[in-house]
Amino acid sequence: MDFEFSPEQQTFIEQVEAFLDANDDPDIFDVTRENMAQIVDTPKRRQFMAKLGEMGWLGMTWPKEYGGSEGEGVYEYLLNERLAGRGGPQIGKGVGIIGKTLIAHGNDFLKDEFLPKILRNEVEFAVGYSEPNAGSDAASMRLKGVRGERDGKTGWILNGQKTWTTSAHFAEWYWLGVRTDPDNKHRGITLMLVPLDQPGITINKIDTMGGVPMGDERTNEVFIDDVFVPDEYVVGEVNSGFQYISQALDLERFTMFTYSPIKQRLDVLVDHVRTETVDGEPIKDDPIVRQRIGQLATEAEVARVMGLRVVSESMKADAVPGTPPPTVESSEYKLFATEFSKRLADA
């Protein structure tokens, strides 16, 4: 595995850094928002993402026929690392999870409707997979879709609930997993696009154990009652949604789960240890503290290398036809980095 970036990639990094310097704004970049910094939930953040589109950085890996530049996936990773390092909104959901799935599996109507808007950042999506009894096991989702007709159109009538939908209160469209075959767990899920501003959709704020939603941020539960979805808003084949979801999650795990926030938290901890005292004694001189910091620094380096491994394997999959994506490696990285972030927070 080669973890060195090419001269072209180094040039791109420099271009991104210069662009971010020129567009620095505390209303856009805020590292204190931590994991919630990546969402595009304010007018200024939406305007900033539109500027990324003007630079040609939304859809860098898309085919040219859909407005992309057919670049390597590593460029999306490099862009997100720089955005995450400053606490800025990141690409991945619209461009990656939704855009790439539409390119691969969407009908012409959906491609024409959404792909140009994604490249210009004119539409915001919420992703609806998780349910009260379907979290890590997304294939257990039960939000029900049955065949129906309304206003002369055929489609699906939806009823059920989703939870932990972070963007539902400001997004325009719902990227929704629906149970369309109750007898087949993995081959009974269909992806649909649903407008959120319609009767039958109720969005409620979720409060966490601290009494506030996700710190200073918000997540939601969404109730769907007799909502009709025309057939043209079904993504790909009926009952093939879980396959599409799995493919998209491979992308999310290495483009949206970045290393920079981990490094920031470790640096804050190290700075604290360097300056604080207990009973007049510097805690940096405590051998137990030093051992713990060394262990955390080692684990942070492991997380960095695991992420780069996924990037390297993804580049190989892009370059060599027939090479499978690093599904296992990306899952390992996501799990390790998440668990390590918890250990770092507890330290």
Q: What kind of region is each of these model predictions?
A:
Residues 143-147, 266:
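A structural signal for short hydrophobic beta-strand segments in well-ordered beta-sheet cores
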Residues 46-124, 167-173, 300, 314-329, ...:
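Internal helix-loop-helix
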